Amino acid sequence: MSWRQVILLSSLSALVLLCMLQEGTSASVGSRQAAGEEVQEGMKQKIFMQESDASNFLKRRGKRSPKSRDEVTAENRQKLRDDELRREYYEEQRNEFENFVEEQRDEQEERTREAVEQWRQWHYDGLYPSYLYNRQNI
């Protein structure tokens, strides 16, 4: 077989295969469209409720009628959860600030101690023992 015959045969087989696949997909689209419409109807039924159910849903409890026990407990649980989260947040903020203040205070004390030590070394005349040994006990 020459290379021309091989190319002609392969292109012809590819053309036949594409034609068959195109007919198969066009036949399946029609059934999928019908199935898609059925699915959309099902979705509408899930999303939208009947008019009578909707009016009953809105009229279930008026503004001035007392809340049910379940509603009250759910609201109380939500409030308690919010209070706990708020308490934890402020406690964490307070701890971070206290740690920051403690670090700042320690750094300031260290700088002050070093400055006092340098002053004592500079002004020490050598006649007396150093300040540490010259403390007056009261």
Swiss-Prot record:
Composition bias, Basic and acidic residues: 67-85
Keywords: Coiled coil, Extracellular matrix, Secreted, Signal, Sulfation
Coiled coil listed as a keyword: yes
InterPro entries cross-referenced by the UniProt entry: UCMA (IPR031386)
Region (Disordered): 58-85
Superkingdom in the source lineage: Eukaryota
Family affiliation: Belongs to the UCMA family.
GO biological process: embryonic skeletal system development; negative regulation of osteoblast differentiation; negative regulation of SMAD protein signal transduction; osteoblast differentiation
Gene: Ucma
Listed name of the protein: Unique cartilage matrix-associated protein
Keyword Secreted: yes
Native species: Rattus norvegicus (Rat)
Propeptide segments, given as residue ranges: 28-64
Described purpose of this protein according to its UniProt entry: May be involved in the negative control of osteogenic differentiation of osteochondrogenic precursor cells in peripheral zones of fetal cartilage and at the cartilage-bone interface.
Tissue expression: Detected in immature, proliferating, mature, columnar and hypertrophic chondrocytes from ribs, tail, vertebra and femur.
Lineage of source species: Eukaryota, Metazoa, Chordata, Craniata, Vertebrata
Coiled coil spans: 78-122
GO CC aspect terms: cytoplasm; extracellular matrix; extracellular region
Compartments, record wording: Secreted, Extracellular space, Extracellular matrix
Secretion signal, residue range per the UniProt entry: 1-27
GO terms assigned for molecular function: BMP binding
